Regions:
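Alpha/propeptide regions of enzymes that mature by internal proteolysis
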Residues: 2-246
Length: 247
């Protein structure tokens, strides 16, 4: 297995001669103005943990989408990233999260505006595997319960760093500050590919805003004959050009 780190988009890669590959990213804003050497070290540690979680599944013969979900799980649970716990806050001070999971055969599931799902990528997977739909906006508590995914109060997702960033944005700072949308793409031993993305959006975004991450072809895309893509950046720009599909 080989690993590498690339900045400013913090990226980790694992691959082998068998063809299995896992690439993860912590987003374009993961090393922002609030970064310290200690925080950067924690980010790199969490990235390695995420890489290991997904890659071990690939080595055991698991399909690509399971490796993607496992890697994203670790990052959603780590408060340094803008996904799950540690998500950026909306203008009304809540965590409102999006996620998407897509496989190379064109099957896809996504959620937007979830505020109590502990791991939004699990909800995206549930939409893909348990419903006939592609995208759910602000699913009900009953729907979430039916999917069998874990939940938390919204307070669980909110960190002091995100509160500070929101206060700065609302006092005239950079309201479009990026905080590191996360993602993963994988290729399994059978040659199948998958992509997943999870995000809390942009600090101080309006309630109900939807970025590129949960939109197939915009922030997340997988096509067996071409490529698997997970994007990070300003979602509005990606949506306008259907960026992931253009790669």
């Amino acid at each position: 297995m080989t690993t590498s780190s690339v900045s400013p988009v913090t990226t980790e890669l694992a691959g082998s001669e068998t063809g299995i590959t896992l690439i993860i990213h912590a987003g374009a804003g993961s090393r922002g103005k609030h970064s310290t050497p200690e925080r950067i070290a924690q980010v790199e540690l969490d990235l390695q943990r995420a890489l290991d979680a997904g890659y071990q599944l690939l080595e055991s013969g698991a399909p690509a989408h399971e490796a993607v979900v496992a890697a994203i799980h670790v990052m959603e649970d780590a408060p340094e990233f803008n996904a799950g716990r540690g998500a950026a806050l909306t203008s009304d001070g809540i965590a409102q999260m999006d996620a998407c999971l897509m496989t190379g055969d064109g099957e896809v599931g996504a959620v937007t505006g979830v505020s109590t799902v502990k791991n939004p990528i699990d909800a995206a997977r549930a939409v893909k595997e348990q419903t006939k739909h592609v995208l759910f906006a602000d699913p009900t508590d009953a729907e979430i319960a039916d999917w069998g995914v874990a939940t938390e109060s919204n307070e669980y997702f909110i960190t002091e760093q995100r509160r500070q960033s929101l206060a700065e944005a609302q006092s005239g700072g950079d309201e479009w500050e990026k905080h590191g949308t996360i993602g993963a793409v994988a290729r399994d031993a059978e040659g199948n590919i998958a992509a997943g993305t999870s995000t809390g959006g942009i600090t101080n975004q309006m309630h109900g805003r939807v970025g590129d991450s949960p939109l197939p072809g915009c922030g997340t895309f997988a096509n067996q004959s071409t490529v698997a893509v997970s994007c990070t950046g300003i979602g509005e720009a990606f949506i306008k050009v259907v960026a992931a599909h253009q790669v």
